[in-house]
Amino acid sequence: FNTIGIDLVAMCVNDLIVQGAKPLFFLDYLAVGKLDLKKSKKILSGIIKGCSLSGCSLIGGETAEMPGIYSKDNFDLAGFSVGIVSRKKILSKKNVRINDIVLAIPSNGIHSNGYSLVRAIIKKHQISKKIKKDLLAPTKIYSREVLKLVEKNLINAAAHITGGGLVENLLRSIPEELSLQIDLSKIKIKKIFKWLKKKKISDEEMMRTFNCGVGFCLIIPPKNLEKIRKVFPKK
């Protein structure tokens, strides 16, 4: 349970930085049937770590016991984050131009999308400890790197690759009159996605359900490519 909190924060702050906004603070909400202190402390530790990684403050939240709504072992976890950005630095599809480059930033794994399909698969197949670990890898938080680029005006637009995969999320980040060319051969596919593909999932469903190794995309002017590459580790 110590990585769920990271996922929660990541899904909020990664959506904020798509607009160029710096995450300022985060609040969480945990609803349970009966409070399990050991479990809730692990969840909270993940939220704290997520806030630390994203550079925002955890300023409050609520924990509610509702035995009439939730069974003993079930819980509901939610949260939200508020960010700030100067109007002149807002990232928008209006900024995108013909011949801009789309840069794919690697994911840690499947992040926080596609788990309904994953659960259906693992009900039918035995999985190793390594696969379990890979499936639970927390969502990567991109705020520190992306905000450096926003501050230097190096990005035109961005996309957080969540449900809907590369195509659906990227299309929301460009004007309707433009189109994209994606070179899939440039994407390094992690082993966890190769494992999932072997479970008889079609290419179309893989691309629509999972990030397939790309957690975030930047749409940039070609002249800024080398400057941006220096911000991210070569791996």
Locate predicted features:
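Short, compositionally biased
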Residues: 115-125
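Generic structural signal for well-ordered alpha-helical scaffold segments
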Residues: 13-14, 147
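Short loop/turn motifs at secondary-structure junctions
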Residues: 20-22, 117, 154
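Glycine-rich anion-binding loops of enzyme active sites
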Residues: 7-8, 12, 22-115
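Glycine-/charge-enriched secondary-structure boundary and capping motifs
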Residues: 39, 43-54, 70-75, 124-136, ...
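Active-site mouth loops of central-metabolism enzymes
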Residues: 1-6
